[in-house]
């Protein structure tokens, strides 16, 4: 138990969900301060319920705490009610386990999953009493290190971090911490530690790099400022997933969180090669965990947590080679224990539907398809390996099996998209509804009709994808496309069976700016944060007018970052990073997209993306 909470009872009684801040959850790790050498605080810059659902944090938390010389604790962004109180009463941000101020730690590690959380990073630093700019931090400040998918273009937030860890976190934290201990013993100081850290694999230390610009605002050069600092940084990768660390005792929250279940990561990476998908490129090559190990992990974690549900985690679970064996095992074992099984990321085919009928309450569940584009032409452009025939066949099988609700996910604004492609969203939704009426006899229809929920998000080009050079639509173009989709749905024969939802355009445009921005955007982030912006990922706290004011005040044009097609010879802000996928491959895929040519998946034929040099996973395994 904590000797004393950082927040007194009066404060805890005033705020929403005080259990977010008191620690002491089941499986939380508490160590003796005097018996450890390094204190590390892991941060997810969003509200507790979202951060506690993140598998990456659980893996790193468990791994770091498995070492006798390190104590890893956790911190999340305080919700707006507590934020106000902490500022008013000068309460420093604290870690959950010890309730000690973050400023007393050796490291603050921040996982960065989403661009719209950038202002929350500033909130965390500010509340902790850590200078926002890395160059203004003294010897007594924690080393602030960033990781996660957004670090594949770290430049918009480079000024706020001492180090970025590029790649998967299981491989280089031990060498980094050993270096820190060595430098502390030698009393080298902060700057020398960072200089040495910059020479470790996967470590990017922004202060040792400089950017110059052309008059038109594009990058002229990006280079190290000192000898011995690498000009190019390659991502870190776990080559053997079966032997890598996995948390057998994940922390169990007191309150309901987004993912309140045991999460079993069955593989990392994806074979599919969708051209809009950043994760599919960043996590190459596909690497599987051994099925016998997964069986053992599942039972151990269920025993250690008391959770009543287990979920398989993967970008594409259907592509896991031992899926039938694993699912048969889980169905048998979980049925005995009254444990529910969640199976996301499954392709809709006869096998998947048979499995889902065994593990789900059909009457309560909905079936999900992600066609991503309304026409086959556009699905070929984005390399989405899903045909209309497969979608309709899967729908028919599902309706025969008792499903009456279908969720469809599309993106608006893909490169080369036409009005005909957009109308295809409405037409496909209508065809699925028609399939229900053609398949299910009238007397067997629940409530008389099927419910099709069609949702559209807006396309955001991301680094290290074939679409990294593509222009993004403007807000006005996005809104026009959404209105056209809504109108087209209203004209369909089965329009009463179709419900349409769409995303906010303002947020998508800003996400696109931050995703492909450069270091100049740090001044925009500082401006909006000082104007009171944080929790921008939450619509009720997003203030687009303040962001537009910031761009104007900083003499920067957001359209420069989002709305222009970038030439292939332009230096991109993230070009100094090596994610394993070659630029030549991405250029080939960009041209294939323009030619409406599909690429086979990794199991069908190697496309020479570059990931084979890691010497692991599907790249070295026999293909089907």
What residue ranges belong to the model's regions?
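Canonical Radical SAM [4Fe-4S] cluster-binding loop centered on the CxxxCxxC motif
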Residues: 54, 256-292, 608-623
